[in-house]
Structure formats: structure tokens, C-alpha cells
């Protein structure tokens, strides 16, 4: 019972911390990501914002996770080249989990090369491999 209460409190604390520190994306920032143009992206975001959790609709993403989610290869490559945190989780979700969900095997490989933790767990105890498996992304699950 004590373990359940401790786990519940920890999950609640992580969720609260993420919601306090997350910021809303501006219209200009959302449009900059959609272009997949590095110069447009750099004009909309400061380097300090690359690893912040930004709320977009009902989800929270780092710019790396968001670019992976929307298949913006130029921005993903740019962020990886500029040392974005490959293990930064927003609401428990890491960039590797996003790549796994959408079956982006090549990006998952790049994330792993950059040091992504394939054993990281979300707030429900799921790993990137679990996400790949649940979404029938067999090729991605195989590398995890």
C-alpha cells in the first residue's frame, strides 16, 4: 500500500512539474515547425527553448519530439546536430517514444546513437519498445 501511495505521489509530482514549466507555443512557433525550414525555425525559437516542454493543443513536446512527431526531418537533424536533449521527457514521453510510436526507425537509430535511453519509462511504466509494439511498428520495435 505504501508503495502504491509513493508511486502515485511521484507520478503526480512529475505531471505537476511538467505543467508548471511547460509554455504555450505561439502561432509563429507552430508555423515555424510546420515549414521544416531551419532558418525559419531559428528565427522563432531561441536555443534555450529547444529542450523546453511546450504545450501544443493537449500535448506537451520538446522541439525534438514535436519535429519527430510531424516528420520534420530538417528540423530533427538540426536539433540533433545542436545537441538537443535526446532523453528530455515532457509528461513522461521521450523523443525515442515518439519515434517508436510513429515507426520512424531511422530517427530512432539516430536517437540511440546520440545516447537516447531505450529503457526509459513513461508515467505508466511503458518503454519506447512498448510504444512501437502497441502501434504495430515491428521494424522499430526490433531495434529497441
Locate the predicted segments by residue.
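Short, solvent-exposed interaction modules
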Residues: 100, 108
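Non-membrane alpha-helical segments in proteins
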Residues: 61-70, 95-98
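Non-cytosolic coordination micro-motifs
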Residues: 113
Amino acid at each position: 500500500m505504501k508503495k502504491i501511495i509513493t508511486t502515485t505521489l511521484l507520478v503526480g509530482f512529475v505531471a505537476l512539474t511538467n505543467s508548471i514549466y511547460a509554455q504555450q507555443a505561439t502561432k509563429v512557433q507552430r508555423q515555424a515547425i510546420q515549414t521544416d525550414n531551419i532558418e525559419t525555425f531559428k528565427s522563432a525559437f531561441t536555443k534555450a527553448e529547444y529542450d523546453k516542454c511546450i504545450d501544443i493543443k493537449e500535448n506537451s513536446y520538446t522541439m525534438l519530439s514535436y519535429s519527430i512527431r510531424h516528420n520534420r526531418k530538417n528540423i530533427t537533424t538540426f536539433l540533433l546536430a545542436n545537441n538537443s536533449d535526446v532523453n528530455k521527457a515532457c509528461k513522461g514521453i521521450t523523443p525515442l517514444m515518439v519515434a517508436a510510436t510513429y515507426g520512424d526507425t531511422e530517427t530512432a537509430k539516430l536517437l540511440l546513437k546520440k545516447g537516447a535511453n531505450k529503457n526509459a519509462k513513461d508515467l505508466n511504466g511503458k518503454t519506447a519498445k512498448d510504444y512501437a509494439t502497441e502501434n504495430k511498428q515491428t521494424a522499430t520495435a526490433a531495434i529497441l
